[in-house]
Structure formats: structure tokens, C-alpha cells
């Protein structure tokens, strides 16, 4: 019996200018790419054309919905904005329902402070569960987001973050 690679897209959950989460998403995406037996795609919600005059499944984005339906699991990279998650991410997530059922999801929180997005993860978990996603035990926490990467977008403390991502991805898959 032939096995296919697991498809685990990474979703960058913010569209703000100057977003520090973009480098985190690229780092996480790179870590998934290094894993044997995995395929991935980086989905940036900034590039999705979602109308804002409706809600829920009425505004499904065909490509996003197809990608989520095909996925074996998901990784969300989410910045912490005043202890919460970006409204646009919630708007995008609400556009699908059946596509999420029983899929594993891991969340990487990003924050300027020292908690590594823990508070955004705490606030997002009930939403993910309500959507039918199965949340994993380990989180990806990225503290001090503005200082994590050098001017070329490379993570400074590669060893520490690679170890954390190895644990995170091991739990997810």
C-alpha cells in the first residue's frame, strides 16, 4: 500500500502592516518543509479576497476552502493583539465548517511581550474547537517578535526554535 505525504498548510493569520508574524510564519513553513512525509503551503490571509459584507459559509473562498478540505491538519500562526486574535482571521475561519471536522490544528502564538502569544492561543482554542478542529497539546510560542529575526528575516536563536518546532510538529503529526 502506497502512502501519500500528509498535507499540513501554514496559515498566517494577520494582514496588518509591519506584521512581525510574517517572519514567524515563514520560519514555521520552512520547518514543515524540512520534514519527510509532509507537504505544505503557506496561506497568507492578506492575499485572500474575502468580502466583508457577509459572514460564515456564504463567503467561502473557493481556493481556501479546497485547500482546507484537502489538508490533513493545519498550523495557524497568530499574533496577539490586546490579548485577542485578529478579526480578519476569525472572519476567514468562519467561512468554512465541514472542511475542519476532526482535523488536527496546532497554533503558534506571536507576541511582542514575553508570553509568546499564550493569551491569543487561550482565546482562540474555544473557537477552533467549535469549528470542529482538534487542538494539539503543544503550542508554538514566539516571544519578543520584533527581535526574533535578523534584518534578512532569519531567526536568531535557530537551535532553540528548531527544537520547539520539532516537538510541536511531532505532536501535530
Regions found by a protein language model. Name each.
Residues 1-96, 155-173:
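N-terminal beta1-alpha1-beta2 submodule of the flavodoxin-like/Rossmannoid cofactor-binding fold
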Residues 105-145, 160:
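Short, glycine-/small-residue-rich phosphate/pyrophosphate-handling segment
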Residues 41-50, 98, 132-152:
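Mobile beta-alpha loop/short-helix "lid" or hinge segments that flank ligand
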Residues 101-102:
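His-Asp phosphorelay/catalytic-motif detector in bacterial-type signaling
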Residues 42, 73-86, 113-123, 141-150, ...:
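Hydrophobic transmembrane alpha-helix bundles
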